[in-house]
Amino acid sequence: MLSWMDCAFSNDGKIIFAAAVVIDTSDFSIIETTTASRKVDFPYIPGLLSFREAPACIDAVEKLKTNPDVFVVDGQGIAHPRRLGIASHIGLLIDKPTIGCAKSRLIGTFDEPGSKKGSHNPLMDSGEKIGEVLRTRTDVKPVYVSVGHKCTLDDAISIVLECTTKYRLPEPSRLAHQLVGQAKLG
């Protein structure tokens, strides 16, 4: 079982909504979903986004009745200036394996991966490998995968690819995004 998490803010930015979708990776069936919302109590500071988003994600995780093997977060793991993005932050707090899968690069340099699905190249920062730039669909922009907590980069890449069917973003990511959007609308 795998859980994917996503967040969204109210239009005025005062409330944060989080969603966790637990799926069976063998058939992508939804096992459980939870949502949470709370007042935003930390200002926007670049590089410290997890202090704004992680509390709501933890609230959603704590509502789960199932116990997923791994949590994937829409955001960075160690591919972060402080090597502690939201996926790492949440992993430390829940003491579970976490993976960061982001739509955009926060830091680092890379050579563009090949155009075929599954192609990937290292994401580097100051000589350190901090993640992989992974093509999840042929001829489509890549995603940025990094270790969050208690997992290997190879496992993170495999999990993200396994969950990617017909779109750029892995299917559980799309489900979590839809769920948090519904929670935001009330």
In which residue ranges do the predicted regions lie?
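C-terminal binding/interaction regions
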Residues: 1-5, 54, 59-61, 65, ...
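Short acidic, Gly/Ser-rich segments with clustered Asp/Glu that frequently serve as metal-coordination loops
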Residues: 7-13
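Short, well-ordered, mixed-charge alpha-helical segments that flank or form enzyme active sites
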Residues: 12, 79-82, 106-110
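A glycine-rich, hydrophobic loop/mini-helix early in the fold
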Residues: 13-67
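Short, glycine/charged-enriched secondary-structure capping and boundary segments
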Residues: 18-19, 85-88, 113-114
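Flexible, glycine/proline-enriched loop segments at strand-loop-helix junctions
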Residues: 44-47, 74, 80-81, 140-147
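Catalytic-site beta-strand/loop segments enriched in glycine and acidic/polar residues
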Residues: 58-90, 94-96
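Short hydrophobic alpha-helical runs that function as membrane-insertion/retention elements
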Residues: 97-102
